[in-house]
Amino acid sequence: MHITQLNRECLLCLFSFLDKDSRRSLSRTCSQLRDVFEDPTLWPLLHFHSLAELKKDNFRLSPALRSLSICWHSSRVQVCSIEDWLKSALQRSICSQHESLVNDFLLQVCNRCPNLTSVTLSGCGHVTDDCLARLLLSCPRLRTLRLENCARVTNRTLAAVAAHGRALQTLHVDFCRNVSAAGLLRLRAACPNLRLSAERSAAMIPDQPPRARVCAASAFSAAPGRQSMPHPTGSY
């Protein structure tokens, strides 16, 4: 029996066992298999392990998408996490090649995938509060949002969760240095039933513009009998 003699249900099952590249390669063999590749029901889950994968044409976005993860574990993540005003020309050049990729991709998700229920972003140092706020508005069924080592995420994302994350049940903002303890406490007060994790976030040093850094250092050195206060960590 030739593969094209299988019915649609069998072909979808067969495709479901293949990775994205293999699905794309098989779809190029004939129009029938290309139609299977284009079937939205084939794409309820999407997992990306590098930002380069976001630019490929080996997947499809549709209202059938339920779970999305973008996990970038690369040495370049450390470069992305450096404060913009501290980056060298070389580091800025490296970031310019990919800094808009995740935000642009998530905007496509907002437009095409309204039924999304779970999003995980790890090592996405350029994803912004505005982009996440739009995601929460565009995907009202979102139940789980996991953010890890996303340097540009701030208390504005927490405020967006409180305002727009009506279906959200679980939020992780782990190792996100610009999320503060005060912001987490406000979110906890606004959403007492939310399962909230902020591993190390409130204990990390947030970004400070050069002038704020100098002023803070001057005030600290001038303060008599200064004492260090412990930062809260873990779940809130």
UniProtKB/Swiss-Prot annotation:
Keyword terms of this UniProt record: Cytoplasm, Leucine-rich repeat, Repeat, Ubl conjugation pathway
Record's keyword annotation contains Membrane: no
Cellular component per GO, a single term: cytosol
Signal peptide: none
Main location, first listed in the record: cytoplasm
Top-level taxon in the UniProt lineage: Eukaryota
GO MF terms held by the record: ubiquitin protein ligase activity
Subcellular location: Cytoplasm, Myofibril, Sarcomere, Z line
Coiled-coil intervals, chain numbering: none
Keyword Ribonucleoprotein: no
GO BP: proteasome-mediated ubiquitin-dependent protein catabolic process; protein ubiquitination
Ranges of residues in domain F-box: 1-46
Tissue specificity note: Enriched in cardiac muscle (at protein level).
LRR repeat ranges per the UniProt record: 15-40, 43-72, 98-123, 124-149, 150-175, 176-201
Pathway: Protein modification; protein ubiquitination
InterPro entries noted in UniProt: F-box-like_dom_sf (IPR036047), F-box_dom (IPR001810), F-box_LRR-repeat (IPR050648), Leu-rich_rpt_Cys-con_subtyp (IPR006553), LRR_dom_sf (IPR032675)
Purpose: Substrate-recognition component of the SCF (SKP1-CUL1-F-box protein)-type E3 ubiquitin ligase complex. Promotes ubiquitination of sarcomeric proteins alpha-actinin-2 (ACTN2) and filamin-C (FLNC).
Oligomeric and partner information: Directly interacts with SKP1 and CUL1.
Name this protein carries in UniProt: F-box and leucine-rich protein 22
